[in-house]
Amino acid sequence: MTISYEAVRDFLYREARYLDDKQWESWLEMYAPDATFWMPAWDDRDQLTEDPQSQISLIWYGNRSGLEDRVFRIKTERSSATIPDTRTSHNISNLELLEQSDGVCKLRYNWHTMNYRYKTVDHFFGTNFCTLDTCGETPLITAKKVVLKNDYIRQVIDVYHV
């Protein structure tokens, strides 16, 4: 089964809205139970790390339960990174469907997120690479690789920033 460009675009816009509106449960439902979420780090040679199991990553969750735990901490104020509460605006551009076959869609897109906290606006930007399972009624994210392109991060970065 293939999915249209417009359907993928709307799916990604919905994910961005869920993050901006703090609709955590709806956001989690967009991920398959075995979905990976990975933000590799830049190494000393200015190259992205390639293996989340053996090299440093900015974020690594091997399945959705890691994301669920993160959301639990955010919602129950057990996350100093989210106190005081932040406000975000996610913006998506340059969406490309790279490959489609047998209910799988691979895509990439650029993003820019503005984050307001402590009377300051921070800008985060990068490129995401996603794999979607398109076999069901609605797509599910089975893998997301977030390439953060900022050289300097003034404070912590979290799943809702990207």
Swiss-Prot record:
InterPro entries: Benzo_1-2-diOase_ssu, NTF2-like_dom_sf, Rng_hydr_dOase-bsu. It comes from the Bacteria. One of its GO terms (molecular function) is dioxygenase activity. Transmembrane segments: none annotated. The keyword NAD applies. Pathway: Xenobiotic degradation; toluene degradation. It holds the Pfam family Ring_hydroxyl_B. CDD domains: ring_hydroxylating_dioxygenases_beta (cd00667). GO terms for biological process: 3-phenylpropionate catabolic process; toluene catabolic process. Keywords: Aromatic hydrocarbons catabolism, Dioxygenase, NAD, Oxidoreductase, Plasmid. Its EC number is 1.14.12.-. This dioxygenase system consists of three proteins: the two subunits of the hydroxylase component (XylX and XylY), and an electron transfer component (XylZ). Belongs to the bacterial ring-hydroxylating dioxygenase beta subunit family. This is Toluate 1,2-dioxygenase subunit beta. The lineage of its organism: Bacteria, Pseudomonadati, Pseudomonadota, Gammaproteobacteria, Pseudomonadales.
